Amino acid sequence: AVLNGSTWFLSDIIFFYLIFKYLYRFIIRNSWRTILPILSIYMIGYILLCFSTTKDYSAGYIYFYPPFRLIDFCLGICLYKFYQSTKGQKLSEKIAKGISCWQAFITDTIIVLMIATMYELAIHSNPNFRCAALYWLSSIILVFYTVSIENGKGWLSYLLPNKILFWLGNYSFEIYLWHMLCFRIIQSITLRIYGEDISYSGIQFIISLSFTILMSWISKKYIVIPTYNKLKNIACK
């Protein structure tokens, strides 16, 4: 199931790239009055389908199915469309410069707490709910806010340009592909050694994250970059 998650994700990405040109053109060229009703009907249908399943992993299989992952991609394009609009630019500028330092500090803290809440919900919530719409609103808020605070006043605007975070950002794709497998491996090892003792959960998380970063670095250096260079050379011939 862990490996299936990564392979399904790659399938979703390939499927999206094949239709990106047409999907992007449709969303950018049409008005919100056309886009929002169509997308809303699609989202409601997907949510109803997720909550109608009762068997284990059924909601997960539906979640990974490429046509339903189009919802995430559509939301991303819609967010870009809004960000480029006059209203989006005004809101972005207000977030960056139109609030005081204290307001920025509080807002940054709320965003971090939102991420922590989403993490806890992802672990403990019902799969039908988790696979339906858990990440839609939070992802939109997080992406828009992160882009807007590039020159902001809050502590996140000073933390995000950090060299370590920049370095990790270059491996974000590999980290995403590896994290489920690496965390599961470390979890199985610690369960055998320590049982379900929650006092070791913090150490387990640190080891799992370190293992994920290590595997991401190895795969990018010895697989991703060499493969990319070979394909680039073939394409240039």
PLM features: residue spans?
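Specific transmembrane alpha-helix
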Residues: 8-26, 41-92, 115, 131-156, ...
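Membrane-proximal cytoplasmic C-terminal regulatory module of class A 7TM GPCRs
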Residues: 162, 225-237
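Juxtamembrane loop-transmembrane helix junctions in multi-pass integral membrane proteins
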Residues: 30, 56-62, 95, 126, ...
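Active-site-flanking alpha-helical
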Residues: 19-20, 186, 227-232
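Membrane-interfacial entry segments at the cytosolic side of transmembrane helices
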Residues: 29-37, 92-106, 200-201
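A recurrent flexible, glycine/aromatic-enriched loop bordering the glycosyltransferase active site
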Residues: 2-4
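Alpha-helical transmembrane segments of multi-pass integral membrane proteins
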Residues: 73, 103-225
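Central hydrophobic cores of alpha-helical transmembrane segments
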Residues: 34-44, 110-111, 162
